[in-house]
Amino acid sequence: MDLDEARIRKWNSRHLPVHEPGLIDVVRVARDGTKATEITLGNDDSEKVVLPSREPNLFFSTNVSECVAAADVVLVSVNTPTKSQGIGAGAATNLVALESAVTSVAQAAKPGAIVVEKSTVPCGTARTIREILSLGSQ
């Protein structure tokens, strides 16, 4: 999920917002699912295997609360730039976007959901995230 609707449209299209060799194939199968497929092993066509159909299980959306409420695992990955003003400007990490995202997760996550923080953050940030999550789940 992302708050940027244009980015989500790209993830839901054939033209992903990032280029990584082979990524479109992986995303397409997970996002769109597949039909059952019969493949032949070896060169002599003697051994055939049927790969079962696959339901879609990768979704891109701007609806944060709905997505988080349905998720068993939530990966939080937001931009964490260097602060540009105030105490620590030019050196400290700006955690405003991270704290906002974690607050949204805390308000919507179901009990027992696993929250994984994937942004580049300073030591001790996990403690802050835990506090936000515990306050939001009350």
Residue spans of the language-model regions?
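Rossmann-like NAD(P)(H) cofactor-binding subdomain of soluble oxidoreductases
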Residues: 82-138
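Conserved N-terminal Rossmann-fold NAD(P) cofactor-binding segment
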Residues: 3-73, 77-92, 135-136
